[in-house]
């Protein structure tokens, strides 16, 4: 299969002068289209930093990162924004829902903000509501939902545009064990049935095992 993510000799530091912190030090890895990869490592090992670099949320780094055949570091802002909108869905530990919008409007928000009409998105919305088990909650407000349900809304929002890649940063970090299992089963379903490539950062071995492969970060380098 084609490599959809390629990271080559990437280094990243924070701070200046005597306070420089080397988070990544020549990290290299690749993810093939259709894989479900878990990125693991000790706290502070640079897992989330690497995920953010891959997603183009931070472009100050040394080395090369390619996503969907495009060099993240050389893209202009508009081209990077277009790449993210078309090919990437982001899921974070915190759900970041708009509390005065109902479930379906939260899911639609990124697409409508980029000029899509709700009528154009109806079929995709109905499908993703069914996949995420939120059909009966489409008119519910976020404050009436459990943490697991709110994270499902966040996932639905991330995948409504049918991205090639889901980048998930500790997506179950705030959830109980039952909700964690439900969310991980949902990711597996999106990977196996929708063919979405998933790269998740997790500290949980149990969550990592839902994926097809584990990459570990040690001393700023990737192993495995």
What do these predicted ranges mean?
Residues 3-214:
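ABC family nucleotide-binding domain
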Residues 214-224:
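H-loop (His-switch) and adjacent beta-strand-loop-beta switch element
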């Amino acid at each position: 299969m084609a490599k959809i993510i390629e990271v080559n000799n990437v280094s990243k530091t924070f701070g200046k002068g005597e306070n420089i912190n080397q988070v990544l030090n020549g990290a290299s890895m690749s993810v093939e289209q259709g894989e479900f990869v878990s990125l693991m490592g000790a706290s502070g090992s640079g897992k989330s930093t690497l995920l953010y670099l891959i997603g183009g949320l931070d472009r100050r780094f040394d080395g090369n990162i390619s996503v969907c055949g495009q060099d993240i570091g050389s893209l202009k802002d508009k081209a990077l924004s277009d790449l993210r909108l078309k090919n990437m869905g982001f899921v974070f530990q915190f759900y970041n829902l708009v509390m005065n919008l109902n479930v379906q409007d939260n899911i639609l928000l990124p697409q409508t903000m980029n000029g899509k009409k709700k009528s154009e998105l109806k079929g995709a919305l109905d499908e993703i509501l069914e996949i995420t088990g939120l059909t009966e909650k489409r008119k519910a407000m976020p404050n009436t939902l459990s943490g697991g349900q709110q994270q499902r809304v966040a996932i639905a929002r991330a995948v409504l545009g049918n991205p090639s890649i889901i980048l998930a940063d500790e997506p179950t970090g705030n959830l109980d064990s039952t909700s964690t299992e439900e969310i991980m089963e949902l990711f597996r379903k999106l990977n196996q049935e929708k063919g979405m490539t998933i790269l998740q950062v997790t500290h949980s071995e149990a969550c990592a095992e839902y994926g097809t492969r584990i990459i570990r970060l040690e001393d700023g380098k990737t192993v495995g």
